[in-house]
Every structure is written in C-alpha cells, then in structure tokens.
C-alpha cells in the first residue's frame, strides 16, 4: 500500500486486513526520494501479491510519484495494481475510531481550494461526487476527523471497490497547452 498524495509519504505491507509492517514520514515535497527506500525496508523488500495506491486528490507531484511507482512495481513483480481515493482512506480511518453513520471529509487542495466529499459507513462509499470549493467558502461543523494526513496503515479498513491506478487531481493542471500561431 502506497500513500503519497499528501505531505506525508507512507507505505504498509498488509495481509488479510492486518498490517504486517509500515513506515510513514511527513516529507513535504520529498516523495520521490523517500518512497522506494521506504518500500525496500519493508519485510521481503515490500513485495506483495497486490499493490494499492492513493490516487488523490492531493499533491500533483506526490500523486504522480505514487502511481508511477505502484505501476512499475506491479509490472516488475507481475501483480495487480489498484487505486483508492485519499478521501476514502481518511473516511475509513474515521469510521474505525468513531461510531458515526456518515462523515464529510475536507482536505486542503492548495491553490486556495479544498476538496470535499461525504461518505457513508456501511458499506464505505461516496454519497456525493468530489467537490473542489474555494477555501473561504467552506464551513466545517460536526465531529472533526483530525488534522493529520492519511496513513497507508488505514488501507486495511477500505471496503469500497478499487479504482484504476490513475491520478485523481481534483482540478485542472496549472500548465496550459501552448498554441502555435
């Protein structure tokens, strides 16, 4: 399990919904340098029967690093690769600790935006589409899910169907195509 969509970089080796080993660090922009050594330090070099990767939304570069690494390892090891949403990971961790039927996850999306998505507990599922809203337009009420980034260890709690291992950016890229005149 690989999580690089936020300021954190975390990995976990999970077997039968049980975390065998994990590592996590808040790295900011250092995902590319930290990810592969973290995986290599897991038992068996981190080799697994399947790879799950956080597809975002979150850090543009962090998402690309995680998805590219997951795809490369999956190809090299001959194992399937699947994705999940960083917001679903946060919701799963919340439900594991709280007796609530629903939660709305709000994370900082950068560029003055926040990503917002509600989830239901059983089965863990989205109850509305991902929204990108200006940071000053959000009023958060009710229970607080916490300020920390998602952690790969919580992937064992996910029950939703996996996503294809493709980035979920949450907004259009800042780079714009140039048109020759």
Residue locations for each model-derived region?
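Short, conserved beta-strand segments within well-ordered enzyme catalytic domains
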Residues: 12, 24, 50-52
